[in-house]
Amino acid sequence: MAIERTLSIIKPDAVAKNVIGQIYARFEAAGLKIVAAKMVHLSRGEAEQFYAVHKERPFFKDLVDFMVSGPVMIQALEGENAIAKNRDLMGATDPKKAEKGTIRADFADSIDANAVHGSDAAETAAVEVAFFFPGMNVYSR
């Protein structure tokens, strides 16, 4: 099995609900290590740049507005099959369709306020981790 890194964002809705610790406990219980983390309030420019892949989609403006509405917790996770493990923990994008016991089923309110973001592939994970943690501030352990 390959050791991978993936990016995870706990979105403003979940930060406001004070469930960061509960989400972190799920990462750790699944064997994922938090190798970098920071709380930030994204600027509009940062959110637009991070989600640029969705720029032409009808939901882009609402997504950016939501992501700048409050602080977010950003972390790089590391472990065997980290990308797939994190996506399994998150559950379906729409919390109404997410399996019971997933982060979105337990903490998300809607398809827009869906608690968490996670990289979807190795290539995007590398880009996303580098976007928020450039240089030497990711620490394997």
UniProtKB/Swiss-Prot annotation:
Predominant location: cytoplasm
Keywords: ATP-binding, Cytoplasm, Kinase, Magnesium, Metal-binding, Nucleotide metabolism, Nucleotide-binding, Phosphoprotein, Transferase
Lineage per the UniProt record: Bacteria, Pseudomonadati, Pseudomonadota, Betaproteobacteria, Burkholderiales
Active site: H117 (pros-phosphohistidine intermediate)
Family statement: Belongs to the NDK family.
Compartments (UniProt record): Cytoplasm
The protein's enzyme class: transferase
Domain of life: Bacteria
The gene coding this protein: ndk
Natural source organism: Cupriavidus taiwanensis (strain DSM 17343 / BCRC 17206 / CCUG 44338 / CIP 107171 / LMG 19424 / R1)
Chain sites annotated for binding ATP: K11, F59, R87, T93, R104, N114
A GO term for molecular function: nucleoside diphosphate kinase activity
Complexes and interactors: Homotetramer.
Gene Ontology CC entries for this record: cytoplasm
Purpose: Major role in the synthesis of nucleoside triphosphates other than ATP. The ATP gamma phosphate is transferred to the NDP beta phosphate via a ping-pong mechanism, using a phosphorylated active-site intermediate.
Pfam families: NDK
Name recorded for this polypeptide: Nucleoside diphosphate kinase
EC number: 2.7.4.6
